[in-house]
Amino acid sequence: MRIGFMLRNLREPGGIQVYTHNLLEELMALESVHEFVMLYPDAQFVGHFGSRPRVREEVVRFPTRLGWDQLAIPWAAHRLDLDLIVNPKLSVPVFAGRPTVFTLHGAEQFAVPEVFPVSDRFYTRIMMPIYCWRAAAVISTTRMGVDEIVRYVGADRRKLHPVHEAAHSRFRLLQRADLAAIRERYRLPERFVLFVGGLNPLKNFSNLLRAYQKIEGQVEHALVAVGFLRWKFAEDVARIEELGLESRVVRTGFVPDEDLPAIYNLADALLLPSLYEGFGIPVLEAMASGCPVITSTTGCTPEVAGDAALLVNPRDVDDIAHAILRVLSDSALRTRLIERGLDRAAEFSWRRAAEESLRVYEMAARRGRRAE
């Protein structure tokens, strides 16, 4: 089978990019007879996967994103004689002429619509039902995601397949001697709690700052924020100054994946009280690195974290503040969260995700052929 992957999102930093890279790396490592065709919107990524056996790279150009998805990809699929088209994010060609599969990374536009621009909400509410209808199969990164897409858009549950993500193997316990260079590179304080993610309203960074301000005089820890700036980030950045926290909040900006494990190892807790996460990969990355986790009762993070994290109401500033104090002051709780977190992270595997995804692709291709 010749499988084409729509890889327009490789340039977009964040969870979907991490998912795409890790999934493709493991898919190509499997002993498989299938050929993988990487479809890029430009030549920027040519050579990224091309040295692998059974991998072909193709540049498919089109001036607009929607046109690339709906016009250029079907044309390329016909020219390349693809058996299946896969998109690691939301979107598939509506008239592809062959089976399609996409991965759903959450239904946040339905769950918390108030934080999204009207244009985003309109696009998702119109197009998601169409994509689900046209796709031969849909992969969701959580079981909750399956339930949500059935509830919000009436998708056919028989098409939906939960496949969990995982932390990359680079996230692990490191020797303290290996951490000094990273501390110096990013000018990290001696004691700190950590936030990881792109700044946008979903991440609830403003409430995290308010919670941190409430306990500022009770802890010696700084707050380190790792990640890039996303939409509506200006409000979060302004909140730091508004709350008088300029000297206690360290913003590193974007950090390469190779440096993140050391930062997790140095942190005394990960704080991820998001309004919604479609998976929440930092939860598993922190756990695998021996970092206690505080995350939300909402979204998909409870499914990912299990009993290995402290869960808080993300809209309750006092609840977040109390949880931070508990983790930093209760050594028995910290030890329990670290031990459970290491065990929990070990339950997830990118190899298993690749194997399960490939089975979905094979099933979708068979289903599509029967429908012809």
Identify the meaning behind each predicted range.
Residues 1-372:
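Carbohydrate transferase catalytic cores enriched for Leloir-type hexosyltransferases
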